[in-house]
């Protein structure tokens, strides 16, 4: 990427649909009776993997680009797949569908790409087995491929050692098929999209503190779901608007669920000019337009219960910190090591290559901001969030940045480079 002159980013942008909500709309619509229509669905590779898996499980799903139409067959309407279920690069697909498949009357095998086959699955295998699931790692390494033989399940009260929406959701979805109540208690509240949407479809689910509680065997009914813009995707443009002098960006209809809004809280704590307009609620999910203006940022300390609300945004927060004055400390984020890449090490290595003063810790990183950063070759490790973060860094770097495998952004944001270039007045060269 080359940006020989720093041009302000100005204009409006509709952010693609939320990835987490798009996944769940397909899954829950498939388990509901009747038709579910989904608008503003994220047409990214991960969510398309979820569609493919449920089609192989016997669900008719039409994708017209304008909307997704799911012809749900009810909680017990899935049929045995004749092929291996390929989850692609999607950890959400792999972990959530494992919970659903644990309660079926047939056997399934799940796999994914090279990244998925390295990501930890023991975190879902253990609680699902406690419920009675017959789930095995084919290579006996606690990773995919996974073989799941449908079993009779019992509700449990699981105390999760980590705040993970994927773990929680996998257990709750298995709980739909269990005898008795299912409870999941977390150290902090993780994303609650599953609880909100399951309730919207008709499930009996509630929250008490950091515990989600679900009763089994609901009758789920098809719904109309309007997916809000993904705040994790909006985060790159929030950062760009704050960092690039003269910028002013309006991001339309973005989800601001309080279990996901950590990036907004961090931006404001760093003295960022971020304003929420047109606050609304749709299908139980709060939304707003986000107005971002250039600001002089300063370093802060980020850790504790805010981490689950911004875990996917830490790469772009690290970019913000590198250009901010002072020191930023990110801690309690060891989960970054087992994402699509080891995001702690990858961010540190790539920012060092650009001349940043940054060091890794066991559970995060320390960034001494304000250094002039220069061009470099950036290894994305095929991680969409790494690629997008360094595309934003390139707007302010002195010299050319080459992002290896830059098209991995298609996982979550296929139009990312076009949208960024449009806001920059078509002055960027990729």
Regions found by a protein language model. Give the residues of each.
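Structural preference for solvent-exposed beta-strand-turn elements
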Residues: 1-430
């Amino acid at each position: 990427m080359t940006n020989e002159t720093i041009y302000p980013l100005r204009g409006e942008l509709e952010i693609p649909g939320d990835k987490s909500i798009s996944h769940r709309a397909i899954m829950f619509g498939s388990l509901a009776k009747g038709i579910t229509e989904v608008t503003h669905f994220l047409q990214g590779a991960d969510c398309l993997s979820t569609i493919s898996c449920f089609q192989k499980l016997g669900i008719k799903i039409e994708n017209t680009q304008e909307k997704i139409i799911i012809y749900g067959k009810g909680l017990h309407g899935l049929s045995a797949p004749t092929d291996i279920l390929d989850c692609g690069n999607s950890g959400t697909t792999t972990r959530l569908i494992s919970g659903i498949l644990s309660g079926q009357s047939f056997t399934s095998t799940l796999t994914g790409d090279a990244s998925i086959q390295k990501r930890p699955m023991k975190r879902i295998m253990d609680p699902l087995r406690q419920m009675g699931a017959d789930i095995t790692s084919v290579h006996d390494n606690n990773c995919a491929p996974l073989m799941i033989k449908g079993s009779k399940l019992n509700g449990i009260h699981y105390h999760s050692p980590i705040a993970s929406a994927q773990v929680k959701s996998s257990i709750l979805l298995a709980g739909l098929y269990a005898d008795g109540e299912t409870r999941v208690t977390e150290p902090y509240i993780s994303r609650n999209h599953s609880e909100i949407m399951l309730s919207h479809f008709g499930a009996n689910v509630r929250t008490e503190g950091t515990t989600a509680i679900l009763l089994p065997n609901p009758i789920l009914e098809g719904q109309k779901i309007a997916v809000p813009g993904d705040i994790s995707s909006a985060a790159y443009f929030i950062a760009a608007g704050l960092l690039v002098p003269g910028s002013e960006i309006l991001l339309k209809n973005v989800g601001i669920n309080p279990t996901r809004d950590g990036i907004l809280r961090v931006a404001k704590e760093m003295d960022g000019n971020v304003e929420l307009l047109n606050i609304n609620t749709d299908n139980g999910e709060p939304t707003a337009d986000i107005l971002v203006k250039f600001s002089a940022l300063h370093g802060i300390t980020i850790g504790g219960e805010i981490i689950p609300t911004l875990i996917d945004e830490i790469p772009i927060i690290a970019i913000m910190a590198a250009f901010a004055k002072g020191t930023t400390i990110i801690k309690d984020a060891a989960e970054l090591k087992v994402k699509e890449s080891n995001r702690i090490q990858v961010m540190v290595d790539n920012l060092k290559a650009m001349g940043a003063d940054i060091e890794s810790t066991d559970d995060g990183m320390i960034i001494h901001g304000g250094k002039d950063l220069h061009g470099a070759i950036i290894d994305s490790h095929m991680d969409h969030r790494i690629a997008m973060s360094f595309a934003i860094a390139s707007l302010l770097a002195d010299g050319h940045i080459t992002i290896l495998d830059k098209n991995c952004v298609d996982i979550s944001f296929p139009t990312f480079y076009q949208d960024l270039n449009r806001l920059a007045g078509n002055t960027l060269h990729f």
